[in-house]
C-alpha cells in the first residue's frame, strides 16, 4: 500500500513539473531554432589551422539553394582575427600575437534570397616553433603549407642573410623533391 502511494505521488510530481515547464516555455518564449526555408542553401562547418601572423586562405563550404550563385556573409565576427570575403573564398588573418582557439559563423544566401542556417568556422592559431619566418609568403595562399613544412623540418627554403625565402612560385627541382621525400621517410 505504501509503495503504491509513493509511485502515485512520484507520478503526480512528474506531471506537475512537465506541465509547468511546458507552460513556462509557452508563456516566456522557448528557445526554438528557426528552420531554414525549403530549398535553402546548406552551409557546412569548417575547421582551419594557421600560425600566428599568417593569413589562412580557404573557400566556404555550401551547397544547394536556387541557382548556382551563392553569396556569403559573416554573421558572428571572430575575436582574435579578421575575416575578408571575396566571392566564395575567405581570408582569416590572426591579429597580432594571438594564439589559441577562435571561431566565426557564416551564412550562404542563394539568388532567391533564401538564407542557410549559420555554420561555424573553428580556428586554431599556433605559435611557430621552428624559428622560420618567410619574407616572401605574406599574401601567398601557400603561407600555411610553407610554415607546416618548416615546422616538420622537411623544407625551409633558401636563407639569405637573416631572411628565409620559400619562393612559392618557383618549381621544385627533382633533387629538392627527392630530399623532401627522404626527409619524411
Role assignments for model-derived ranges:
Residues 108-110:
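Conserved structural position at the C-terminal beta-strand
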Residues 113-128:
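C-terminal edge beta-strand
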Residues 37-75:
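Extracellular ectodomain surface segments
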Residues 5-27:
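Sec-dependent N-terminal signal peptides of Gram-positive bacterial secreted proteins and lipoproteins
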Residues 24-49, 127, 138-139:
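Low-complexity, acidic Ser/Thr/Pro-rich repeat tracts that form intrinsically disordered stalk/linker regions
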Residues 73-88, 158:
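Low-complexity "stalk/linker" and mucin-like segments enriched in Ser/Thr/Pro/Ala/Gly
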Residues 127-185:
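Extracytoplasmic Gram-positive cell-surface binding/anchoring modules and repeats
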Residues 89-99, 106, 166-168:
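Extracellular/luminal low-complexity segments enriched in Ser/Thr/Pro
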Amino acid at each position: 500500500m505504501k509503495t503504491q502511494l509513493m509511485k502515485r505521488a512520484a507520478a503526480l510530481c512528474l506531471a506537475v513539473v512537465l506541465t509547468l515547464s511546458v507552460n513556462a516555455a509557452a508563456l516566456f518564449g522557448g528557445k526554438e531554432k528557426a528552420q531554414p526555408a525549403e530549398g535553402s542553401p546548406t552551409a557546412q562547418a569548417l575547421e582551419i589551422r594557421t600560425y600566428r601572423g599568417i593569413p589562412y586562405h580557404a573557400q566556404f563550404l555550401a551547397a544547394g539553394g536556387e541557382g548556382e550563385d551563392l553569396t556569403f556573409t559573416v554573421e558572428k565576427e571572430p575575436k582574435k582575427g579578421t575575416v575578408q570575403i571575396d566571392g566564395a573564398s575567405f581570408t582569416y588573418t590572426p591579429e597580432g600575437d594571438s594564439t589559441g582557439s577562435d571561431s566565426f559563423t557564416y551564412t550562404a544566401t542563394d539568388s532567391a534570397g533564401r538564407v542557410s542556417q549559420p555554420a561555424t568556422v573553428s580556428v586554431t592559431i599556433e605559435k611557430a616553433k621552428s624559428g622560420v619566418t618567410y619574407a616572401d609568403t605574406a599574401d601567398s595562399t601557400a603561407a600555411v603549407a610553407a610554415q607546416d613544412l618548416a615546422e616538420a623540418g622537411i623544407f625551409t627554403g633558401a636563407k639569405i642573410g637573416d631572411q628565409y625565402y620559400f619562393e612559392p612560385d618557383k618549381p621544385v627541382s627533382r633533387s629538392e623533391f627527392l630530399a623532401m621525400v627522404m626527409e619524411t621517410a
